[in-house]
Amino acid sequence: MKKYIEKDFPIGFLSQLAERESWRKEIYRPVYYIHKWWAKRLGSVFRGIVLATCSDESADILKSYYSKNCFSDLTVFDPFMGSGVTVGEAAKLGCRVIGRDINPMSSVIVRASLAKYKVDEINSIFIQIENNIKDKIQSLYKTKLDNGKLTDVLYYFWVKILNCPNCENETDLFKSRIFSKNAVPKKDPSARAVCPGCHGINHTFYDCEKTTCSICKTSYNPQNGNINGGTVSCPHCSYKFKLVEYLKKTDQPLNHKLYAKLVLDEGVKVYEKPNAYDFKVLDQVKSEFELLSSSKKIPFVSIKKGYNTNQILKYNYKSWDQMFSPRQLICIHLLCDEIKQLSDSHSKQLFSCLLSGILEFNNMFCTFKGEGTGAVRHIFAHHILKTEVMPIEANIWGTPKSSGSFSTLYKSRILRSLDYKSNPFELQLKNRKSLKISNINIPLNCDIAGNYSDFRKNGPSVYISHGDSGNTDIENLSVDMVITDPPFFDNVHYSQLADFFYYWLNQILNISDDETTRHEAEVQDTDADKFSEKLCSVFSECNRVLKNEGLLIFTYHHSRHEGWTAVYEAIRKAGFICVQSYPVKAEMSVSVSVQQAKTPIHLDLILVCRKSGNEKAEFDAGNILRTSVEKAKTQITELTRSEIKVSPGDSKVALMGRILCELGKMADMEKEINFLRNVEEEVNPLLSDLIVSQEQKIAYPCDTYPDQLQLFE
C-alpha cells in the first residue's frame, strides 16, 4: 500500500501552522533553538512530513496530527541533520532515527538538544557556575554613578578609530552621531547622540538634523558621521579616503574607543559618557588579559579564506579571538574553565552549547538594535560576518534587563527547551488563536547510540554521528524512509560561519584536531556540476540503505534554473524518480534573508522520490508542461485559500516541482535532464500565466510583473 504522502499532503493546513510557528519558533519548538544554526526548517511541517510518510494512504492525517502515534517499527534517516528538526520530530512520533551531518557542530548541538537530563541537576550545575564566577564576571561590568554608588552596565558602546593618513589625527568612524533610538521611531522619536566636540551624550530625535550639545553648546547635525559608504572624511583636515585602501596599508584590525554606556540606576536605564571608573576597569582588564595571553590560554586559530569570511579578512581579522574584546575573552575563558570541569558528558555538551550560543551576542561585530526590542543585533543577523564600525559590548553574565547573556539565555533557551522536552506540545490554530496541544508526543529524552552497532541492537532509539553522508556505516536496505533538508545550491556556506562557534566548542569538548569544520565533501558549492555531484553521492548512499519500497523526501527551493537542473540530475543519477511535490511555508515572510532576496521565496518544495525502475515512457513535451501548470495552479489555489501569501518566486517553486514529477514519465534519464536544461525559455511565459490566472495574495509585489518575473538571473 502506498504512503499517504504519495497521494496527498495538507499544504494549506500545514502552511497556516508553519506561518504561525515562523514568528515564534523559539517558543513553539524551543528544543531546536538552544544554539544557532542556519536555515532551520519548521517543526510543524516536518512533523507533517514524517507522519504522512509513516501513514498509509487511507489515514486521516489531520486527525493523526493531534493524536498519539508510535511508529517504533520504522526507521528514519536524515543525512543532512543540521539542527535536528527531522530527528526530533520523528523521535516525538516514536520512530527510530538516524541523524548524520558532515559538520561536527551539528552532531554536538543535536546531541545536546535531545539527550536525557534531570532538570534539578542542570539547575544545580548552573548555580554552581554562578557561585564560582558570576561575581568576578560582573565586577568587569560595573560602573560608579555620580552619587558614588556602584551599578551594573548593560551595554558599552564602542566606535572604530584610526589615524588620518594626511594629518595623523585620531578619527572616529561614526556613521551617524545618533547611536540609540527606538526600534519603531515613529512610536517613540526620542534618541541619543554623541557630541563631536566634547563627546557628551545628548537627547535628540531620530530624524533631527540640527542639535546643540547641552554640555559644550556645539551645534551639529546628528545624522552625519565621519564615514559614509566606505569613504572616511577626516574631521580635522577634511581629507577624504577609502577605508578599504587604508586597511591595505596595515596588518591589524582597527582599534576601538569607548564613547558611551547604558547603565541601570535604581532599575532605570540611563545613557552616560564613560567616566574615570570605567577606564580604571579597562586598565584592570588590560592587565588581566596580558596575563591570560602570556599563558597562551587563548589559542590562535586562523580564519580561513572563504566566501563568507573574506570580508573580515579584508579588515585584517586573522584569527577568531580577534573578534572579541579583551573583557569578553576573559569572561569567556572563565566560563570555558568552569564547563570543562563538568564530569557528565551530556551536561558538558549542554552548557558548552549555552556558552557557545551567547557568543553570537557577545563579540565586537554586534550592534545596537535600539530601545523597545532585544537590544543586541547579533553577528549573524545578515547571514554573513559583517564588520561593524559602531559595535556594542553587552554584559556577558547579564542582568534581568539584558539581551543575549549567559544567565538570560539559560532561562530562555535551556530551561524552556527542557520543559518542552518533557512534554512536547503541538501548535493548533482555533479562531486565529494559538493553542498548545500536550500529552500526544513521546518525550524527547532520548537514549543516543554512540555507534550503529548499538543502535541496530534495538537499544537506543536515536543514533547521531558526523561525517560524510555519502559514506555511512548503515546496513543495506535497513531504512524505511529518508527525510532531510539538504543545502541549497549556491547558498550560505554554513561551515565558514560555524567555525566562529567551533573555535570555542572545540576547546571545551575536544571535538577534533581539525581547526575548521570545513570538509571537501560538504554539499555547498557555487558550481552547479560540483553541487549536483556531491548531492548525488549522498542520495546514492540513501538509495543503498533505503528499503526498496522506501521513500526519499527532502525540501528544496531555488530561483535560478540551474539550481533545479542540478538537484534533478542528482536525484536521477542516484537512482530515484520524483513522484510528488508539495509547496509549503518555509520562512518568516519578513526575515532578513527573504527580504534581501532578489526574487523572494517564502515556500519550500517537498519533493517525494522513490527508487526508479520499470517506468513506462510517456513522452510529450507539451503535455508535461500543461499538466505541470494545471497541478501547480491547484496547489497555489489551496495555499491562497488558506490565506498564505504566494510570491512570483513561490509560484516558480510550485511549477518546477510539478515539472520534476512529470519529467519521470519520459523514462529516460538523459532525455529528462536535457529537456530540463533547455526548457527555461518556455517556463517564463508559463509562470506569467500561472500568476495572472490566480487571484493570489502576492507577497512583496513590484510595480510591474515583468521585473518580478526575472526568476532565472
Task: Go through the PLM ranges and name each one.
Residues 1-77, 87, 91-471, 475, ...:
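Nucleic-acid modification enzymes, centered on SAM-dependent nucleic-acid methyltransferases
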Residues 83:
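Conserved SAM/SAH-binding loop
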Residues 94, 547-552:
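Short, surface-exposed connector motifs at secondary-structure boundaries
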Residues 482-483:
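Hydrophobic beta-strand segment of the Class I
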Residues 510-512, 550-556:
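Conserved beta-strand signature within the Rossmann-like core of class I S-adenosyl-L-methionine
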Residues 532-548, 569, 573:
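A short glycine-rich, Lys/Arg-flanked "PGG" loop and its adjoining helix->strand segment in the class I
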